[in-house]
Structure formats: structure tokens, C-alpha cells
Amino acid sequence: GFLFSYYWDMILSTKNLRKEVSTDSGTLVILEDINLEVRKGETIAITGPSGSGKSTLLGLLAGLDDASGGEIFLNQHPLHLLNEEQRSEVRKENVGFVFQSFELLPGLTALENVMLPSELNSRKNAQELAQYYLKRVGLEERLNHYPRQLSGGEQQRVAIARAFACESKILFADEPTG
């Protein structure tokens, strides 16, 4: 019983994860021997100086990039064994993102930006979810404002509301506090 529930509570794990890139002067190791376990409901922060590989690690964990070695399991899916199309499907079903640059569409209002991922996934209650999460981040009075009409902090909160509105199993945030 314990091992079974332990395994199914695991939302993300890595074993001996490695990322390297080829350069003119040889192979550069970006990440080496990364072992990580994250259970459902846990929150973790990956910290380190600029250039230490945090964003690279996030890209690997979310299945946005291929590892050079090791294993990555995201909600029991072996990302290290999947091709890009299969990883994309796993992301669609399991992952939400808050990007460093917010990635808001300038021609859409705050409400529409938050609704978009839910609508793309044919969620019936996209508007209700978007309004709920925009209220949770204190932007209920700014629903019909475009990104250019919002401060940087407000744009960031729209991006956070969008990520939560997807109701994903795991949320990745790359420098969510700016």
C-alpha cells in the first residue's frame, strides 16, 4: 500500500538528469546529476544565481526541451522516452506556465487572455474561471483592460491568473516575481 500511494502522489521526479550543449570549444555541461521528487500539493522553489541553469531545468521538467541523459517523470509520464508531439500532449493535459515575459496577447483584454487556454481546450466554463482567478489576483476591476493599459505588476497578475485558470496538475513559473 505505502509504495503504491507514494508513487501515485509523485507529480514530478527526476533521476540523474543531465543537460549538455555542444560549443566550439567542446561540450558544456549545464546540469548534471539532478535528482528531484515533488509530490502533489508541494511547492518548491529553485534558486540560484543568473546563468546557473534554473530556466534550463524548468524547460526540462516541463518537457519543453530534451535532456541529454537521465529520467524525468511528469505525472507518471516518462518525458525522457517521449517525442516532442507526445511531450506536447502531456503538457496540454498536465502543465500550466507563468513565463518571465508574461506572454500576454496585446489584442486581447485581461479577461480574454485568461480565458484563451481554457477555450483552446474546449472548457465550457472558461469565462467563469477567468473571472474567478482575476478576482483572486485583485484585478476584478480591470477585466476589460488591454495589456498596454495595465502596469507591469498587473500584467504579471493576469499571467498568474491565466496559469491558475487552466487548473493544471502542475504549475511552472519562471521568475514569477519579476
Model regions: which residues?
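ABC family nucleotide-binding domain
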Residues: 11-12, 17-178
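Short, Lys/Arg-enriched N-terminal segments with co-localized hydrophobic residues
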Residues: 1-9
